[in-house]
């Protein structure tokens, strides 16, 4: 595990050529799990040189790479177990700071499937990682103004859950 700014930014050619490209029959890519922390703009005192948003874009375009961004410790634990049981390359990005618990212990996580955390009729906020809590807070504020907002945790960025997003549109 390392900072999200460094792994994709400095190692993209090794990740692409040595992890994602090799295939053996039906198996695409090697069975490597890449985990980073300090993702996004939430690195606190580590400063601007450690902030990144482009890591997601870099990893999404690599063939055979799957990208997940858990919202809380429960999601991290369950998704770590899930990806350990699925062959192929994965990129998991986590935040630096402690995040509030959003999911219950009984929540199931399926790679490629988002989770509707709150139903709503007027608008939808699809979020990932630490922004899921921000989306729930925004939905609470909108509710005070009579706006019913659906919130979706899109913890799988690649493959994205097109079905849940199309239903919400």
Protein language model regions, located:
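Short, catalytically relevant binding-site loops at active-site mouths
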Residues: 98-99, 131-133, 156-159
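Conserved thiamine diphosphate
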Residues: 1-124, 149
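Residue-level signal for short, function-critical loop segments
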Residues: 4, 38, 129-131, 155
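Glycine-rich, anion-gripping cofactor-binding loops and their flanking helix/strand elements
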Residues: 159-169
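Conserved strand-to-helix beginnings and helix N-cap segments that scaffold or border functional pockets
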Residues: 12-13, 135-136, 162
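Hydrophobic pocket-lining "lid/loop/helix" segments that shape and contact the acyl-thioester
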Residues: 118-121, 126-128, 133-140
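Short helix-loop-beta junction
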Residues: 134-152
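Short acidic loop-to-helix transition motifs that present clustered carboxylates
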Residues: 73-76, 155-161
